[in-house]
Structure formats: C-alpha cells, structure tokens
Amino acid sequence: MGTRFRILLGMGFVIAVAGGVARAEAWNQFRGPAGDGRTQARPPVEWSEARNVVWKTPIPGKAWASPVEAEGRIWLANATEDGRRLSLVCVAAATGRVERDITLFEPTKPAFCYPYNSYASPTPFVVDGRVFVHFGSAGTACVAADTGAVLWTRQDLPCDHHRGPGSSPIPFEDLLIVN
C-alpha cells in the first residue's frame, strides 16, 4: 500500500467523520477531547469512494500522526519521507481545501527512523487557539491556529528515539508534556 494511498485513506476517514465530530465536540488531540478515544458523535461506519465521503484531498508526505480538528480546521503533522522537511498542514473541514502548509523544521541530518515509522508520527493538539506539534528530537512548535504564525519552536529535547518519534504531546494545566 503506497504512502499517498494511506494518507488519502486516512483523510477519507477523517472527512467522513469530521462533520459529526465537529458538531459534537472538537477532536483536538490524540484519541479525542478526553484522550480516551470516545465521542458522543455517531460517525458513519461504512464508506467507499462515493459513500459517506464529503471530500478528499491529497496530502503529499509520510505521516502516521492522527489528524486533529478544532474550530472548523483539520491539522496534520507531516514530513517528507527523508525527514528533511517537517511541517504542519491545515485543511478546511468544510471544503477540504489546504489552507496552510507550514514548514517548521528542516533537519540537515535527520535521526534514524525505522522504515515502518515516519518522522511525523506524533499527533498534534489544539487548545486555546494554538496548535502544538512535536517531532521528537527534531523539534516542538506552537502555531497560532487563526493565522498560522509560528509562536515558538524548541529543538533542545535530547532523546534517542531508536526507531523514530512517536510520542504525542499532551496538555496539562499550563504545561506541554512530551516523552
């Protein structure tokens, strides 16, 4: 299964459920608003090329991060296959139009990443109008959800991922927790 197909499949799923989830509650972090993978929304459980799909948008890159949604926008962590461009993509939930593709980090010597992983596996989260995205030792960033402006970046997390980044950041009070 090719990378582009997997991304389209993932986007197709998100698109099919985005309307229901967005109306019930924002799916703003890994495993949803409470971090438990549950929602009150009743998304479709079946879809095809034409059934229960509102739109499809190709997103080039290789990323295993889950999409998150808040305030009518879907946010995706993304990376090139070689890990030399790490970005945050914003898609309009209603139309599927890519609103922003924000380059956050451009490592010249990316750390090793196992071929079955990606450089963009951690899921971002959205809170209080800010999007937080973590790429492991390559960097962590905070972006303004309304403008796409990069509010801050950090590249000082010393860690050896062994197989590539995979730890999604979580908010706790006024802290950002990364592992």
Specify the residue positions occupied by each region the protein language model found.
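N-terminal secretory signal peptides that target proteins for export/translocation
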Residues: 1-5
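Bacterial N-terminal signal peptides
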Residues: 8-19
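Noncatalytic, solvent-exposed loop/strand surfaces
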Residues: 21-179
